[in-house]
C-alpha cells in the first residue's frame, strides 16, 4: 500500500492506495496528518514543490514546512514532483489537473455513488492529486526527478 499526499500550507489531502482501489482518503490539518503517519506502515509519497524561477509567497514556504514535518513521522518519504506524475499518467509534461483526473478514471473506473461505489469512491478536489502521487509511487520504484528523505538512525549515547 502507498499513502499519497497532496500537501498544503495548513491542510493536506491524503489517499491510501492498495494498487486497485482507494482504501481511505481525507483532508486533515497538517499536524493531524503527521500524527496519522506515525501509525502508517505503508510507503508514503508526497507531491514535491518545484521551483520554476517565479517569486513565491508565504503559503509555499508553509507547505514546504509541512512536508518537512511529515518526513519526521515516517522512516522514508518519497518526494515525487508533479512533472513526474504528469509524465507517468498522461505521458505529457503539459497535462493539467483535468487530464490527470481523466487518466485515473480511464484506468480505474468511475468514482461511483454511495450505493454503487467505484474503486475511486471518495476522491474529489485535492484528493485527485494525492491519488495521482500514490498511483505513481505504487507503479514506479522511482521517478526521474524524485528525492527521498530517510530519517537518520539516532547515534548511540556516549
Where are the predicted features?
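Phosphate- and other anionic-substrate recognition elements at nucleic-acid/protein interfaces
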Residues: 1-158
Amino acid at each position: 500500500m502507498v499513502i499519497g499526499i497532496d500537501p498544503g500550507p495548513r491542510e493536506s489531502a491524503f489517499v491510501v492506495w492498495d494498487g486497485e482501489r482507494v482504501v481511505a482518503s481525507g483532508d486533515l490539518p497538517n499536524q493531524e496528518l503527521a500524527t496519522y503517519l506515525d501509525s502508517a506502515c505503508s510507503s508514503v509519497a508526497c507531491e514535491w514543490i518545484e521551483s520554476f524561477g517565479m517569486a513565491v509567497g508565504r503559503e509555499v514556504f508553509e507547505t514546504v514546512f509541512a512536508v518537512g514535518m511529515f518526513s519526521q513521522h515516517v522512516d522514508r518519504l518519497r518526494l515525487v514532483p508533479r512533472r513526474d506524475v504528469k509524465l507517468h499518467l498522461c505521458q505529457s509534461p503539459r497535462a493539467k489537473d483535468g487530464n490527470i483526473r481523466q487518466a485515473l478514471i480511464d484506468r480505474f473506473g468511475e468514482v461511483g455513488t454511495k450505493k454503487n461505489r467505484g474503486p475511486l469512491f471518495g476522491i474529489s478536489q485535492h484528493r485527485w492529486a494525492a491519488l495521482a502521487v500514490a498511483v505513481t509511487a505504487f507503479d514506479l520504484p522511482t521517478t526521474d526527478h524524485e528525492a527521498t528523505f530517510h530519517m537518520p538512525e539516532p547515534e548511540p549515547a556516549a
